[in-house]
Amino acid sequence: MANLNQIQKEVSEILSDQKSMKSDIKAILELLGSQNPTKESLEAVAAKIVNDLTKLINDCPCNKEILEALGNQPKEQLIEQPKEKGKGLNLGKYTYPNYGVGNEELGSSGNPKALTWPFKAPAGWPNQF
């Protein structure tokens, strides 16, 4: 793994390359501005820019590491078959009464303080409905 100093060094190199390419592009544009641009000259400039960028990408050490890692992979991926499927979590069955929910008048809970719907706001609460 690269440490922060190596990463900072590579980033600063890329930044300087980018700045030099920016000045190259400005020089090319000035040259094109002084001439009458033709399709061939524009294609040549575009090809040069693409070639320069491709060279920078291919020369990147991280790109080489990725290609080496991909080259070292086996032709077929080996997937381990799962062993026996274990039983799921042993959760207890749902039990009644479920205190704290339901409507008391429907008999769904034995809790006299169960929540009811529609919700009855306690005294002092603003009326929402």
Curated annotation (Swiss-Prot):
Keywords on record: Coiled coil, Disulfide bond, Host cell junction, Virion
Pfam families, per the entry: Cauli_DNA-bind
A GO cellular component entry from the record: host cell plasmodesma
Coiled-coil features, chain-numbered ranges: 1-31, 38-59
Domain of life, per lineage: Viruses
Keyword Translocase attributed: no
Alphabetized GO MF terms: DNA binding
The keyword Transmembrane helix is assigned to this record: no
Residues covered by region (Capsid binding): 122-129
Localization, UniProt: Virion; Host cell junction, Host plasmodesma
Gene3D superfamilies linked: 6.10.250.630
Protein family (similarity comment): Belongs to the caulimovirus ORF III family.
Functional note: Plays a role in virus cell-to-cell and plant-to-plant transmission. Interacts with virion icosahedral capsid and movement protein, thereby facilitating virion cell-to-cell transmission through plasmodesmata opened by viral movement protein. Also interacts with aphid transmission factor, attaching the virion to aphid stylet when the animal feeds on an virus infected plant. Aphid saliva may later detach the virion, inducing release of infectious particles when the animal feeds on a new plant.
Subunit structure: Homotetramer, through coiled-coil domain. Homotrimer when interacts with icosehadral capsid. Interacts with capsid protein, and with Movement protein.
UniProt-recorded name of the protein: Virion-associated protein
Species of origin: Cauliflower mosaic virus (strain CM-1841)
